């Protein structure tokens, strides 16, 4: 089976609507172009794989062996280096984008590292039933109960390996199968995948060919959504606050009315036009 895959970063979740008015929850994944940093072959390495590098960083943030690897192969320094087995047909230094590997509606498997929850009890870790809270049950109520396997003799006097008990929970690889590619946002380098995937926001994600449905495509038609400004809803106030607001409004109206009555109306005076004095000529004066 031909394997295709690409690495990205989980951004978060959202939702879209189809033409049948069905709400479809989606996960948004940021996928910048992955560069091929190495090619493994059956003849030389006894297995076939493609080494991908992603998440470009400054060269000074890498250690000496990593800097030497990228300088030797004339590649951009990146934060992550990881290979995908049985992925063939690519050359050294080639840039891979999700649009080149998948199409809208194609089934894929998405792998990520789940959120780490530390040391947890059996109730949270294995969904055990909580103990009785009353009738003299006593404390604590969240014990997992007996883990005893036998009482001696022919019975085993030990706890078998794999027993569901308290312990470290989370921070493990989780793969969700048979999700579909809903769409691409080439301008922002985003991939929309149906459903939820493991891991926190900002976690590394692997999108690869579906193991159970390789190459199967089921088209998805999304409804065109027109963005509208949300209407401002009046705030709900209690009766006391409504009475206070009404009293303030009435007082403000009364003050404006009183101000209009008290202020005298001043009429503008008509402008007086000054006439020029007549010129009188004196007789009998020679210049």
From Swiss-Prot:
Subunit organization: Part of the 50S ribosomal subunit. Forms a cluster with proteins L14 and L19.
Q: What is this protein called?
A: Large ribosomal subunit protein uL3
Q: An example Gene Ontology cellular component term from the record?
A: cytosolic large ribosomal subunit
Q: Where is the composition biased (Basic and acidic residues)?
A: 269-287
Cited HAMAP family: Ribosomal_uL3_B
Q: Which family does it belong to?
A: Belongs to the universal ribosomal protein uL3 family.
Name its species: Mycoplasma pneumoniae (strain ATCC 29342 / M129 / Subtype 1) (Mycoplasmoides pneumoniae)
NCBIfam families named among the record's database cross-references: L3_bact
For molecular function, the Gene Ontology terms on record are: rRNA binding; structural constituent of ribosome
GO biological process, alphabetically ordered: translation
Name the SUPFAM superfamilies for this protein. Translation proteins (SSF50447)
Q: Which UniProt keywords apply?
A: Ribonucleoprotein, Ribosomal protein, RNA-binding, rRNA-binding
Functionally, this protein is described as follows: One of the primary rRNA binding proteins, it binds directly near the 3'-end of the 23S rRNA, where it nucleates assembly of the 50S subunit.
Region: Disordered, residue numbers = 228-287
**What domain of life does the UniProt record list for this protein's source?**
Bacteria
